């Protein structure tokens, strides 16, 4: 019910009362202050409002209306539960994929600090002492950049806007490109990697993406692909030059036009999206989605709620379908506390 007029027909998450217009999420704290027989106005906390004096049986009272206490930022009532799995597959001799899972959820003085998580998959290219080195190096540089530039400042209370977080995440991917490109020049080989990274802060996710690893979101509305493949076939499909199913079968499906380490500079796709309890995030390499396909991923998400069990089952299905490439996957469940 509305704190001001008592109306009970407001929407659960409504900001204002439909009857009187009071701010539902900002109920003032009102208390009665007795000051004795003197009508002199007492001192009150900054921002508080004081009524005219009220007299009753020789005593003087004031009503003190104080601003509402600061509430927790949206998303502080969430927790992140992650599962992950990487597998060589049934054809390749070497696993050139790397994955990263970092979660942070401290609590200070009974108040929850930012809920933070960094989840990434990198699919290396270049063969022995090439692809596996590139994917590992990219995630090492990205994680250091995010920890120094995002996690530590957030824990110190230096909260950045969503756009600032995304820019820092993209800068981390750019730094990874710099490192891999430099290593490639020194080694004189053609190593490189794709990279998809998801940063979660409270009820928001920031996504940075280069290549054809993918990020998905699963919830009651189904499976949503959050990334666009930087591949020749994906571009052909977008331009109407190939059928959607050719993403799995076209002779040039493995050719990507954007990767980490290929050039001195790289364009990093980015976006910010809301999160809610019940959402599940999936980050995976093409060795998973090419073998299982979107329909198969959705089927497993329906069957298995536990993130680790879902990862294990999806890797099993990818291998049963042929296991033609390395298989890496991270699944993050966004749950209510």
What does each of the following model-derived ranges do?
Residues 1-337:
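PP2C/PPM-type serine/threonine phosphatase catalytic domain
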């Amino acid at each position: 019910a509305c704190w001001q007029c008592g109306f009970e027909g407001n929407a659960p998450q409504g900001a204002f009362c439909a009857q009187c217009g009071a701010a539902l999420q900002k109920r003032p704290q009102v208390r009665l202050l007795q000051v004795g027989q003197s009508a002199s106005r007492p001192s009150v906390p900054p921002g508080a409002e004081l009524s005219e004096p009220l007299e009753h049986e020789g005593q003087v009272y004031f009503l003190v209306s104080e601003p509402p206490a600061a509430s927790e930022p949206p998303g502080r009532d969430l927790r992140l539960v992650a599962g992950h799995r990487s597998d060589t597959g049934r054809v390749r001799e070497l696993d050139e994929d790397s994955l990263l899972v970092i979660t942070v959820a401290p609590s200070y003085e009974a108040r929850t600090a930012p809920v933070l998580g960094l989840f990434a998959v990198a699919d290396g290219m270049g063969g022995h002492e090439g692809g596996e080195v590139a994917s590992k190096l990219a995630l090492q540089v990205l994680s250091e950049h995010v920890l120094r530039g995002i996690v530590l400042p957030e824990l110190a209370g230096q909260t950045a806007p969503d756009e600032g977080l995304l820019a820092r995440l993209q800068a981390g991917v750019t730094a990874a490109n710099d490192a891999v490109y430099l290593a490639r020049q020194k080694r004189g080989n053609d190593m490189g990697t794709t990279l998809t990274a998801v940063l979660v802060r409270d009820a928001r996710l920031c996504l940075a993406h280069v290549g054809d690893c993918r990020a998905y979101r699963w919830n009651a509305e189904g499976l949503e692909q959050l990334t666009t493949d930087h591949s020749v076939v994906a571009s052909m499909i977008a331009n109407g030059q190939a059928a959607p199913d050719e993403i799995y079968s076209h002779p040039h499906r493995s050719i990507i036009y954007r990767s980490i380490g290929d050039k001195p500079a790289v364009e990093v796709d980015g976006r910010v999206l809301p999160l809610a309890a019940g959402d599940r995030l999936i980050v995976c390499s093409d060795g998973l989605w090419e073998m299982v396909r979107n329909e198969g991923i959705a089927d497993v998400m329906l069957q298995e709620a536990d993130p680790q069990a879902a990862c294990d089952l999806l890797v099993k299905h990818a291998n049963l379908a042929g296991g033609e490439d390395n298989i890496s996957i991270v699944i993050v469940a966004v749950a209510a506390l």
